[in-house]
């Protein structure tokens, strides 16, 4: 906005001034001068000063006399009392005694110092500020303090970037700015035709050779403590008249014989000057040497009164101010840490806590409320958090979950074949064998299938693919004979809305039963699995919540039909029989499709009538949002039924598993039947949460023909780690065990004991290193554990799950916000990996990057590094490059419109790596953003550093930077609650200066 567009406050000030002056003017108008208009004769003395009847100047003191009054100007003013004018102490040759700037104020003056200096205790001299003491001056490598300023320096092989703080690795070849011999003292800019152009940092001038930079008085006062003059040879230093030059030619020392001198040239008259000097010599005032006060001086009727600002205490001499160590008293009021600084103190918090805006209290950071904290479940603890994985998954990299390959550990406990599946596994048997009830052992099949066993069916539910999944299981006890051929097929139905349910298949006798082989006992035996993935549709009247929204539902039905070898005839061989059965199966599927389409597919489970409907049910606003499958309402929340219970739809609550059943998972709608022992008197326990709770099972180290008592101990040379098994595993290689009833391979008497990272080979009787992609944390094992999911190890012989790493490069690249992430973060990244990202923002937008922290091992001699350039060329303009660990955050803008980013690691040491967020902003704000990120105050305070590490606060800042209109989403109160006052003041001053540059 131009000047003409601003409000002109002149008229308002005139009205205000008139109102302030009106009462005194009225009093003066009614006052009578002494000796006029009074009655003759002796009268009581009137105190004109007390009644305000005097005509002394506003800057004068009124002293009552027996017959009148006397006016005299206050210290710091001159005149005869009825007219007083301010003395300009800064106008003399000594500049008021100030070595830098002297600011005249009514009745007094104040000394100020240039940037890079601080006022000494005498209130006149200026001392250098050592910026390197606070957070290394914000320098990435080395900070060097100089008079009036500081400089960042880089280690050998690096040069200082444009932001004057970070260091960039030099290239060995090429003619661009990335070459170590480009010749520029400060800033190198790419020029046309492959050449370079040099520029200097603010406060320096480019030398005639167009390469070197000459210091001027505009940068750090030219390195001079007091006065600086620019000459052809550079800055020339001089000292205030009351000081003498140090031998270093820059510092100034106080003279011992200095006295205050007043010359005729800087006084109104010689007489007035003499009076003023005499008065100040006779009476100590704040106008002379600040009254001797360290900080604040105030003239009173009894002389000067010294006081100290908050954070200091006045000493016994009544002049000196001493810093108060607030941390010595009740820890400064800080919850955790207190750090004393000159004139104040800072509170800090332990890791995992954040400082609240009162800048004293610490609050636990709820990491679980942030995005991307854990792959599956997150558990918040005071000061930390823990990730947990769903059943069938293993935690790696602290926060990630990968599928567990159960088959890699003792073949999953399977007697014959183990097949790993996502989130689970299953045991299978060779032809001629059937799976035992314990789902691990295999039993030889003898004779034909029985025809009189009534099937038992249950529905198993759990989380799958982000939703609820229900799996129909048959426990009919019907087994396949060795001459049976299996035909499998599946069909999927898609519906708009439905409810998981289960009922006998007799609902479709007209089509389904005739389609099945006649030699089998029941159609129900043909349902091997039915997979229902849907919303339960269960509504709880009267409970608070939103009405459920229509959801799509998928029902996958998988049929497994059996054909018997005895059906083969001379005219139709086994292949012919299979084709006929497939034809019947397709007919059965068509019948089922029609039933679903006609809404004749009705199922029932646990007292609930659960239907499949083509139209979504009507819901009232009072009806609560439906809970997931296997969940009930408790205190207006959906709670999964715990292990050992199931959800009963009729009673709408969790019920204990009845005798003879068990359930080892949460959120189920049925209980599994306990295996039936030959001894019918075996103990059955209600609320069984595991198969072993059913009672009567053989214990680890034991076995029997059916897995139930009576049991035998595993023979010498065998072991069994699980309960309810029908056999024991051999040690192999002719190895014996230390005793009967062994429960693990570690009980086998091997010739050598293998250390972690190895497994015992029973053929060669040697210890073999675990191959790449596996690990073994224990002694004396005969296997190695496969790494979870898509992870692998860097080398063979791994001993811990932490050595399993995901090699995928992480990150999300958006037009406005995004992040890049090293592989396996926050776990250690893998060896010999390479990642590249390209950030190409929309037109007229620039890139701001925040590196909260980065962990790269310095021991590798820069074998692992992160670099950000304009292009992949090593000679292109580089914005950032590092090969070290920095736990102190830094923010910077890209030197180019787009960024090519590369992370590379060698085969040496590893570390956590990084997660680096970025935001793109309107290029019109370039000057403002640069001003903010280059200000050392952004990083000086540990509290400010924590802001740049706080994912929630960074997200809010980036949200506003990317889309400024989002600023209005945050109220002023919210902003104050999110950020400390010092941070808001810093940003407000810079934004105000950016928006109103002429004020």
UniProtKB/Swiss-Prot annotation:
Tissue/organ expression: Expressed in a broad spectrum of adult tissues.
GO cellular component, one term: cell surface
Location of region: Interaction with the cholesterol-anchor of SHH: 847-856
Phosphoprotein listed as a keyword: no
Pfam families: cEGF, CUB, EGF_3, EGF_CA, Ephrin_rec_like, FXa_inhibition
A single MF term (Gene Ontology): calcium ion binding
Annotated glycosylation sites: 659
InterPro entries: cEGF (IPR026823), CUB_dom (IPR000859), EGF-like_Ca-bd_dom (IPR001881), EGF-like_dom (IPR000742), EGF-type_Asp/Asn_hydroxyl_site (IPR000152), EGF_Ca-bd_CS (IPR018097), EGF_dom (IPR024731), Growth_fac_rcpt_cys_sf (IPR009030)
Signal peptide coordinates: 1-31
SUPFAM superfamilies on file: EGF/Laminin, Growth factor receptor domain, Spermadhesin, CUB domain
Disulphide bridges: 49-62, 56-71, 73-84, 90-102, 98-111, 113-126, 368-378, 374-387, 389-401, 407-418, 414-427, 429-442, 809-835, 862-883
CUB domain sequence ranges: 809-921
UniProt KW keywords: Calcium, Developmental protein, Disulfide bond, EGF-like domain, Glycoprotein, Lipid-binding, Repeat, Secreted, Signal
Main localisation: secreted
The record's account of how the chain is modified after translation: N-glycosylated.
Cellular compartment(s): Secreted; Cell surface
Keyword Glycoprotein (UniProt): yes
Residue stretches making up the EGF-like domain: 45-85, 86-127, 128-168, 177-213, 217-252, 286-321, 323-363, 364-402, 403-443
UniProt GO BP: signal transduction
Record's subunit section: Forms homooligomers. Forms heterooligomers with SCUBE1. Forms heterooligomers with SCUBE3. Interacts with SHH via the cholesterol anchor of the dually lipid-modified SHH (ShhNp). Interacts with PTCH1. Interacts with VEGFR2.
PANTHER family: SIGNAL PEPTIDE, CUB AND EGF-LIKE DOMAIN-CONTAINING, SIGNAL PEPTIDE, CUB AND EGF-LIKE DOMAIN-CONTAINING PROTEIN 2
Domain text: The CUB domain is important for the interaction with the cholesterol-anchor of SHH. The CUB domain regulates protease recruitment and activation during SHH shedding.
Function (record text): Lipid-binding protein required for SHH long-range signaling by binding to the dually lipid-modified SHH (ShhNp) and by promoting ShhNp mobilization, solubilization and release from the cell membrane. Acts by enhancing the proteolytic processing (shedding) of the lipid-modified N- and C- terminal of ShhNp at the cell surface. Synergizes with DISP1 to increase SHH secretion. Probable cell surface coreceptor for VEGFR2 involved in VEGFR2-mediated angiogenesis.
Protein name: Signal peptide, CUB and EGF-like domain-containing protein 2
Gene: SCUBE2
């Amino acid at each position: 906005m131009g000047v003409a567009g601003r409000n002109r406050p002149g008229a308002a000030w005139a009205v205000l001034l008139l109102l302030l002056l009106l009462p005194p003017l009225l009093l003066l108008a009614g006052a009578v001068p002494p000796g006029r208009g009074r009655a003759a004769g002796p009268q009581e003395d009137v105190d004109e000063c007390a009644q305000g009847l005097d005509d002394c100047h506003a800057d004068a003191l009124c002293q009552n006399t027996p017959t009148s009054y006397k006016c005299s100007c206050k210290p710091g003013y001159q005149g005869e009392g009825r007219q007083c004018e301010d003395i300009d102490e800064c106008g003399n040759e000594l500049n008021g005694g100030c070595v830098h700037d002297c600011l005249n104020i009514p009745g007094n003056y104040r000394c100020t110092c240039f940037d890079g200096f601080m006022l000494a205790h005498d209130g006149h001299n200026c001392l250098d500020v050592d910026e390197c003491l606070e957070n290394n001056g914000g320098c990435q490598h080395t900070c060097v303090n100089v008079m009036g300023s500081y400089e960042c320096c880089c280690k050998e092989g690096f040069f200082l970037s444009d932001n004057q703080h970070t260091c960039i690795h030099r290239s060995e070849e090429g003619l661009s700015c990335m070459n170590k011999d480009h010749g520029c003292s400060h800033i190198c800019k790419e020029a046309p035709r492959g050449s370079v152009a040099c520029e200097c940092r603010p406060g320096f001038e480019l030398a005639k050779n167009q390469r070197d930079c000459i210091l001027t008085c505009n940068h750090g006062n030219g390195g001079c403590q007091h006065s600086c003059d620019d000459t052809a040879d550079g800055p020339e230093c001089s000292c205030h008249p009351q000081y003498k030059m140090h031998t270093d030619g820059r510092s100034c020392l106080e003279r011992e014989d200095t006295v205050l001198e007043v010359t005729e040239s800087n006084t109104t008259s010689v007489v007035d000057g003499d009076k003023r000097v005499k008065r100040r010599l006779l009476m100590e005032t704040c106008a002379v040497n600040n009254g001797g006060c360290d900080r604040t001086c105030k003239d009173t009727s009894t002389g000067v009164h010294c006081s100290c600002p908050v954070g200091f205490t006045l000493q016994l001499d009544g002049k000196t101010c001493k810093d108060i160590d607030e941390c010595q008293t009740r820890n400064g009021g800080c919850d955790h840490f207190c750090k004393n600084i000159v004139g104040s103190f800072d509170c800090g918090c332990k890791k995992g806590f954040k400082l609240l805006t009162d800048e004293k209290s610490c609050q636990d950071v709820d990491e679980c409320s942030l995005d991307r904290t854990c792959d599956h479940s997150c558990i918040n603890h005071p000061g930390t958090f823990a990730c947990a994985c769903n059943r069938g998954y293993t935690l790696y990299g602290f926060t990630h979950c990968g599928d567990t390959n159960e088959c890699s550990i003792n073949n999953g406990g399977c007697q014959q074949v183990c097949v790993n599946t996502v989130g689970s596994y299953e045991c299978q048997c060779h032809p001629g064998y059937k799976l035992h009830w314990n789902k691990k052992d295999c039993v030889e099949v003898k004779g034909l299938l029985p025809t009189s066993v009534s099937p038992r069916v249950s529905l198993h539910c759990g989380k799958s693919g982000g939703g609820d999944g229900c799996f129909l299981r048959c426990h009919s006890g019907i087994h396949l004979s060795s001459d049976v051929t299996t035909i499998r097929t599946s069909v999927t139905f898609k519906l708009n809305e439905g409810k998981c349910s289960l009922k006998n298949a007799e609902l479709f006798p007209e089509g389904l039963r005739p389609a099945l082989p006649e030699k089998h006992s029941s159609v129900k035996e043909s349902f091997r699995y039915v997979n229902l993935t849907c919303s339960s549709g269960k509504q709880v009247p009267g409970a608070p919540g939103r009405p459920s929204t229509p959801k799509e539902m998928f029902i996958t039905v998988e049929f497994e039909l059996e054909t018997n070898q005895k059906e083969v005839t001379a005219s139709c061989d086994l292949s012919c029989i299979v084709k006929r059965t497939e034809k019947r199966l397709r007919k059965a599927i068509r019948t089922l499709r029609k039933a679903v389409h006609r809404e004749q597919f009705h199922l029932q489970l646990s007292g609930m009538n659960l239907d499949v409907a083509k139209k979504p049910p009507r819901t009232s606003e009072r009806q609560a949002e439906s809970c997931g499958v296997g969940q009930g309402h408790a205190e207006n929340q959906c709670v999964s039924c715990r292990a050992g219970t199931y959800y009963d739809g009729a009673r709408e609550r969790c019920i204990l598993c009845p005798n003879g059943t068990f359930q080892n998972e949460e959120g189920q709608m049925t209980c599994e039947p306990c295996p039936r022992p030959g001894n019918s008197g075996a103990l059955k326990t209600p609320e069984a949460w595991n198969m072993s709770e059913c009672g009567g099972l053989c214990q680890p180290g034991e076995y029997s023909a059916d897995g139930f008592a009576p049991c035998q101990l595993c023979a010498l040379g065998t072991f069994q780690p699980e309960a309810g098994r029908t056999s024991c595993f051999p040690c192999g290689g002719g190895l014996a065990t230390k005793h009967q009833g062994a429960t693990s391979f570690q009980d086998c008497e091997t010739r050598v004991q293998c250390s972690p990272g190895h497994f015992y080979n029973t053929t060669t009787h040697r210890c073999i290193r675990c191959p790449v992609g596996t690990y073994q944390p224990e002694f004396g094992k005969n296997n190695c554990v496969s790494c979870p999911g898509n992870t692998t190890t860097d080398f063979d012989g791994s001993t811990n799950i932490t050595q399993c790493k995901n090699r995928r490069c992480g990150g999300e690249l958006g037009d406005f916000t995004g992040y890049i992430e090293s592989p396996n973060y926050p776990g250690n990244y893998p060896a010999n990996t390479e990642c590249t990202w390209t950030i190409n923002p929309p037109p007229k937008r620039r890139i701001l990057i925040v590196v909260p922290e980065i962990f790269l091992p310095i021991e590798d001699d820069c074998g692992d590094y992160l670099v950000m350039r304009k292009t992949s060329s090593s000679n292109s303009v580089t914005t950032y490059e590092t090969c070290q660990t920095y736990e102190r955050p830094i923010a910077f803008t890209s030197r180019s419109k787009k960024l090519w980013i590369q992370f590379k690691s060698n085969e040496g040491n590893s570390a956590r790596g990084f997660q680096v967020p970025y935001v793109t902003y309107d290029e019109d704000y370039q000057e403002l953003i640069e001003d903010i990120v280059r200000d050392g105050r952004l990083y000086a305070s540990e509290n400010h550093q924590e802001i740049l590490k706080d994912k929630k606060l960074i997200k809010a800042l980036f949200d506003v930077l990317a889309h400024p209109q989002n600023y209005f989403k945050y109220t002023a109160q919210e902003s104050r609650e999110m950020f400390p006052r010092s941070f808001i003041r810093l940003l407000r001053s810079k934004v105000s200066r950016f928006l109103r540059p002429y004020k």
